[in-house]
């Protein structure tokens, strides 16, 4: 019985730590860049896009396809960096224990 109560206490502590970490992730921002800086995307580590910046040279009808490709690339780069930031925080929380794939914050 004492083991069960100890586990419940640990679970409550972990839940509290995860909530605090989620709040931290809202304040961590990463930047994805493509086209050598022609397009950049900033997002939080919780995958919320904050800004998209586009070099004015890309804003014309002839460059629409290029701009679309660069946006996709910049978003993917920012997403990858946000995932990495989230994983670093998770490892700090779990003491390096591996969590099952897809178990994020």
UniProtKB/Swiss-Prot annotation:
GO molecular function: DNA binding
Keyword presence, DNA-binding: yes
Keywords per UniProt: Cytoplasm, DNA-binding
One cellular component (GO) term of this entry: bacterial nucleoid
Entry annotated with the keyword DNA-binding: yes
Location in or out of the cell: Cytoplasm, Nucleoid
Gene3D superfamilies: Nucleoid-associated protein YbaB-like domain
InterPro entries, alphabetized: YbaB-like_sf (IPR036894), YbaB/EbfC (IPR004401)
Organism domain of life: Bacteria
SUPFAM superfamilies the record matches: YbaB-like (SSF82607)
NCBIfam families per the UniProt record, alphabetical: DNA_YbaB_EbfC
Subunit structure: Homodimer.
UniProt cross-references to HAMAP family, sorted A to Z: DNA_YbaB_EbfC
Task of the protein: Binds to DNA and alters its conformation. May be involved in regulation of gene expression, nucleoid organization and DNA protection.
Family: Belongs to the YbaB/EbfC family.
Annotated protein name in UniProt: Nucleoid-associated protein RPC_4847
Taxonomic source organism: Rhodopseudomonas palustris (strain BisB18)
């Amino acid at each position: 019985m004492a083991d069960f109560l100890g586990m419940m206490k640990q679970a409550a502590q972990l839940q509290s730590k995860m909530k605090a970490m989620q709040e931290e992730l809202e304040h961590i921002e990463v930047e994805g860049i493509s086209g050598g800086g022609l397009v950049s995307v900033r997002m939080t580590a919780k995958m919320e896009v904050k800004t998209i910046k586009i070099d004015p040279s890309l804003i014309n009808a002839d460059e629409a396809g290029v701009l679309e490709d660069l946006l996709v690339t910049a978003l993917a780069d920012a997403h990858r960096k946000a995932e990495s930031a989230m994983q670093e925080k998770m490892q700090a929380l779990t003491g390096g224990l591996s969590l099952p794939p897809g178990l994020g914050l």
